[in-house]
Design a protein with these regions (language model features):
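Helix-loop boundary and gating motifs at the non-cytosolic
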Residues: 7-48
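Helix-breaking motifs and short loop linkers at transmembrane-helix boundaries and internal kinks
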Residues: 41, 73, 94-99
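Residue-level signature of mid-helix packing/kink "hotspots" within the transmembrane helices
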Residues: 55-63, 147-148
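Helix-to-loop junctions at the C-terminal end of transmembrane segments
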Residues: 62-73
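Structural signature of the two symmetry-related core transmembrane helices
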Residues: 76-90
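Paired small-residue
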Residues: 99-107
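Cytoplasmic helix-loop-helix junction between adjacent transmembrane helices
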Residues: 106-142
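C-terminal membrane-cytosol helix-exit motif in multi-pass small-molecule transporters
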Residues: 172-186
Length: 186
């Protein structure tokens, strides 16, 4: 008996899109506390609140994400969320005041919550039902791979580069991931 084919060009593209999304996220994650304290003179409590805004926003939108993905067309929602997620890195470059940075952080969390749910849903849609568990497992492995590389690269860059360079690298990773996401056929 032959197994249904898991590795297709579209599956590889969504794996790459997921890795690049999470790499962009994890690249700046360990650097943000330094950025907030050095650029905005934020104290530790403020840094904690700002970083939490992202996660709280992502958690708040996830239940609605599932409903929207079941009600509306999935790929456009995925691409819109991915685009917003990526564009926010450019916003970080331009945020000159802390209140604007906080608003961007909240929108970033909302986009992250939507794009991650949408990505998982699309993986399920484009893979054979007999191999969905395996497909989602490998898809999640891209998160873990980015988690193991991104913070290390981000902290190394913090020692050698400007904050703007780090944000531009996250933006570049997001743009490349968005291109991969656009190429996925559903």
């Amino acid at each position: 008996m032959t197994k249904d084919r898991l590795v297709t060009i579209d599956y590889c593209r969504i794996l790459a899109a997921n890795f690049l999304l999470f790499f962009a996220f994890y690249l700046i994650l360990p650097v943000l506390p330094f950025y907030l304290t050095e650029v905005f003179n934020a104290n530790n409590a403020t840094v904690g609140i700002i970083l939490s805004c992202y996660t709280i926003a992502a958690l708040c939108i996830r239940p609605f994400s599932g409903y929207l993905l079941d009600t509306l067309s999935r790929k456009p929602l995925y691409l819109i969320a991915y685009f917003i997620f990526t564009a926010i890195f450019a916003g970080y470059l331009l945020a000159g005041i802390l209140s604007l940075f906080i608003m961007l952080r909240i929108v970033h969390g909302l986009a992250f919550g939507m794009v991650t749910v949408a990505g998982n849903t699309i993986v399920i849609d484009i893979t054979p039902s007999s191999r969905r568990g395996e497909a989602v497992g490998y898809y999640g492995l891209m998160n873990n791979t980015a988690m193991s590389i991104g913070p290390m690269v981000g902290l190394f860059m913090h020692e050698t580069c400007s904050f703007n360079t780090i944000f531009i690298c996250s933006l570049t990773s997001g743009v490349l991931g968005f291109i991969m996401a656009c190429l996925v056929r559903t």
